[in-house]
Every structure is written in C-alpha cells, then in structure tokens.
C-alpha cells in the first residue's frame, strides 16, 4: 500500500483558524485544505499563515473554493480571470500549489463544454506561469456539470498539464452515480481526493452536503467502493477529509480531528 498524504479541510472543525491548525497538527495530519473564509478571518497575512502552518509541520495543500468560473459569457469570463489572479497572489504567499475550481452553479453559465474547456485551459495556463495547478470538481448541484465523468471530459478537452480533476466521494455518491469509471482515469490526472460520508436523508443535495456530512464509515454511502476505484486509477495523492456538519462545528475540535 502506498502511504497517501493525509489532510483535512479547515471547514471540518470548530474554532478559530489557529485553534483548527493546532488540532489538525495534534491529530497527526500532514496538511490542510484551506477554506478562503477561514483565511479571511485570520488576523495575520498569508505569509504569516504559511509560517504558522510550517511551524506546526502542516502543508497548505489546497485553497478553495474558486466558484462560478467556467462556461461563462466573455465579459464575465474576463472578470473571473482577474479574480483568479488575485487568488493566485494569495496562493503564492501561502505556498499553496493547488486551487479547487468547482463546477459553475450560476444561472448565467452556458451549457457549452467546449467553451468551458477553453476557459479552464486559459486558467490553467495562467496558473502554470506561477507554478500553480487547478483542480476541477463536479459539484452535485452544478448547473451543467454535476458528474465526475462530465468534469473529466472537459479536463480532457482542455488538455493542459496544470489542469486536473478533483474527486469527492460525497458529490458522486449523493447522486447515486457509479464510481467504477474512476478506475479508467489516469491516476496522475486526478489532483486531489476528498472523502466524506453521509447518512441517507430525504432533502435537497445542497442542504444535505452543507450540514450532514460525516467521516468515512460513519454514514451510509459506499465510500469504500469509491476509494477502491480511485486507487485502481493509480492515484497516489492526498486523501483528504472534507466534512460539512453542524454538529462538528460545535464540538471541541481536538476530538473531531482525532476521530
């Protein structure tokens, strides 16, 4: 078995970012997915945050989210590129190599995979100039792209070394999508893996996703099967826990991180 780098999203824990980082380091994780909101409430600069993570032995492995980017009319696309450059500035200061670009949920997004591919290619090209990478993830409630197969098809069309796929067990399994096809994706084109489970609940997928996810094995989704197919692809990057859950946000964070 390969030893995968273990990370956890800062959104998975309660407390200030400083408290979260301490709990994550104490629980033995290698790195974090940094949520922009956590960074915005951090009292110091991006450089100071990078130093703090370094001191705790944590890498900042992923910055997120970058929303509503691809498949946009030209004027909105140009504005989004400006937005991207500001994100890249922050990432450079954080020493963070990868940004998560989630599939567009905006009503202005066009159902045009070729346009989405071309726009993501441009984003990847700009990231590459700074030595950064872009991971594209299908959100279960994306407007035109909500399945990993659709996201992978767009990544293939974009055909850029600095653009890859981000997989999330919740987004795939919550829609009842079959993860078997992940095994056919070249492992090096998968840039990041997020794992979350959830109890089976009757509600909109966005409410379910944002309030009721839990750790792998604590819910009713077949996360093991999903993980198995991802390993079969040859993927050997991060194994990250991204858990949105109201209870965890109110629980002492050391206990959550150790669990």
List where the protein language model places each region.
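Histidine-acidic metal/acid-base catalytic patches
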Residues: 1-7, 14-27, 54-56, 95, ...
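Acidic-and-aromatic substrate-binding clefts and catalytic sites of carbohydrate-active enzymes
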Residues: 10-18, 34-48, 68-78, 105-111, ...
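Active-site acidic/histidine proton-transfer and metal-coordination neighborhood
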Residues: 18, 55, 70-165
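Short, conserved active-site loops that position catalytic residues or coordinate cofactors/metal ions
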Residues: 27-36, 61-68, 103
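Residue-level detector of anion-binding/catalytic polar loops
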Residues: 30-31, 59, 97, 133, ...
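Conserved beta-strand positions in the central sheet of alpha/beta enzyme cores
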Residues: 33, 62-64, 100, 135, ...
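Active-site loop/turn elements of alpha/beta-hydrolase fold enzymes
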Residues: 36-37, 65, 101-104, 139, ...
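Short acidic, glycine/proline-enriched helix-loop-strand junctions
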Residues: 41-60, 132
């Amino acid at each position: 078995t390969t030893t995968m780098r273990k990370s956890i999203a800062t959104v998975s824990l309660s407390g200030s970012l400083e408290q979260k980082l301490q709990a994550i380091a104490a629980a033995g994780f290698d790195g974090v997915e940094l949520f922009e909101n956590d960074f915005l409430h951090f009292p110091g600069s991006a450089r100071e945050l990078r130093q703090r993570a370094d001191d705790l032995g944590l890498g900042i492995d992923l910055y997120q989210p970058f929303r509503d980017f691809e498949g946009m009319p030209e004027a909105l696309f140009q504005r989004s590129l400006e937005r991207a450059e500001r994100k890249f500035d922050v990432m450079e200061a954080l020493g963070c190599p990868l940004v998560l670009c989630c599939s567009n949920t905006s009503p202005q997004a066009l159902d045009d995979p070729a346009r989405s591919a071309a726009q993501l290619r441009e984003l990847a090209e700009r990231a590459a100039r700074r030595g950064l990478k872009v991971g594209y993830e299908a959100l279960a409630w994306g407007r035109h792209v909500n399945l990993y197969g659709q996201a992978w098809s767009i990544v293939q069309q974009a055909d850029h070394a600095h653009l890859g796929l981000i997989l999330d067990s919740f987004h795939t399994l919550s829609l009842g999508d079959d993860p078997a096809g992940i095994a056919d994706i070249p492992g090096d084109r998968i840039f990041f893996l997020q794992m979350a489970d959830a109890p089976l609940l009757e509600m909109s997928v966005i409410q379910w996703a944002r309030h009721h996810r839990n750790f792998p094995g604590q819910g009713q989704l077949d996360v093991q099967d999903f993980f198995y197919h991802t390993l079969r692809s040859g993927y050997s990057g991060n194994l990250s826990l991204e858990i949105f859950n109201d209870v965890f946000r109110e629980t002492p964070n050391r206990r959550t991180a150790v669990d």
